[in-house]
């Protein structure tokens, strides 16, 4: 009898937790590893070029941007 009650309670708990997480992750990507891979790929330090407004003294500007400004502190990447 006690074992049956424990099994029923466990099944109800697992069902409730599945419903809660399914509702929470509806608008998110399915696989966490894919999401983390995209975040790592888009990480600011992972790029080999400077984005708009970033300094271009130590790295080249990304395609479509030019190094403008100069001076003692170096320029910045601008369109």
UniProtKB/Swiss-Prot annotation:
Residues where 4-hydroxyproline is found? 60, 63
Q: Which UniProt keywords apply?
A: Disulfide bond, Hydroxylation, Ion channel impairing toxin, Knottin, Secreted, Signal, Toxin
List locations, semicolon-separated.
Secreted
- All disulfide bonds of the chain are 49-62, 56-67, 61-77
Any one GO MF term held by the record is: ion channel inhibitor activity
Q: Which residues form the propeptide?
A: 23-47
Tagged with keyword Ribonucleoprotein: no
Cross-referenced Pfam families: Conotoxin
Family classification = Belongs to the conotoxin O1 superfamily.
Q: What is known of its domains?
A: The presence of a 'disulfide through disulfide knot' structurally defines this protein as a knottin.
Which protein is depicted?
A: Conotoxin Vi6.9
